[in-house]
A protein has these predicted regions:
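Repeat-based scaffolding regions
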Residues: 1-204
């Protein structure tokens, strides 16, 4: 580490390389906060440096700092720091974790808590909102604020497109203002999946 510091002082042009190497060392040593302190100013001054963006993303990921990583997704995508298939997997991972970590603010009214869950869903790009895993996470967040009715139509559309047992199980937990629509959807699925154990439990 001392050699890296000396390199930065003696060879200013090598400073970026030395900082990247130092950040990698800090990450390996699990000194994540120090790595972030080192990387954030560099990312701010050199926003298009893909190596720095990847290191910062890795650090946030290892810290479980999903909120900071979510804010970094735009730059990771814009500067093509990660290949498209890995980028989509990372996005899904980040939003799934944000949803699973959702805790309504106890100081809020019930309506404010419902809005809090809705705002989290609005953070998710529209192109990802038909992902069954994310809808499961959204359902779980809405369940905490007694607002699962909001997601009924989205669940039906998603299950119609692709059968997803976890989503079907949650469909059975829906408390809805339109139970007849819920029953109609369930009966349609039953004709296509007459012996599906998850569906049979969901329909009671």
């Amino acid at each position: 580490r001392m050699l890296l510091e000396q390199l930065k002082v003696g060879h200013p042009k090598a400073k970026l390389l030395a900082d990247k190497a130092l950040a990698e060392m800090l990450i390996l040593e699990e000194q994540f906060h120090k790595a972030v302190q080192l990387l954030q100013p560099i990312a701010a001054s050199k926003p298009g440096d893909r190596g720095i963006l990847r290191l910062l993303a890795d650090t946030y990921y290892l810290m479980g700092d999903w909120s900071s990583l979510q804010k970094l997704l735009h730059d990771l995508n814009y500067y093509k720091a990660i290949n498209p298939s890995n980028m989509k997997a990372l996005e899904l991972d980040v939003y799934a974790n944000l949803l699973s970590d959702f805790i309504p603010d106890p100081e809020f009214t019930l309506q404010e808590q419902k809005d809090q869950a809705g705002e989290l869903w609005e953070l998710i790009p529209k192109r990802l909102r038909n992902d069954a895993e994310l809808i499961c996470g959204y359902f779980d967040a809405l369940q905490q604020v007694n607002d699962t009715d909001r997601v009924q139509l989205l669940m039906v559309k998603t299950i119609n497109k692709r059968w997803h047992p976890e989503l079907v199980a949650r469909f059975g937990q829906l408390v809805t203002s339109a139970p007849e629509k819920q029953l109609l959807a369930g009966e349609k699925w039953l004709s296509d999946h007459p012996e599906d154990p998850v569906l049979l439990v969901a329909l009671g």
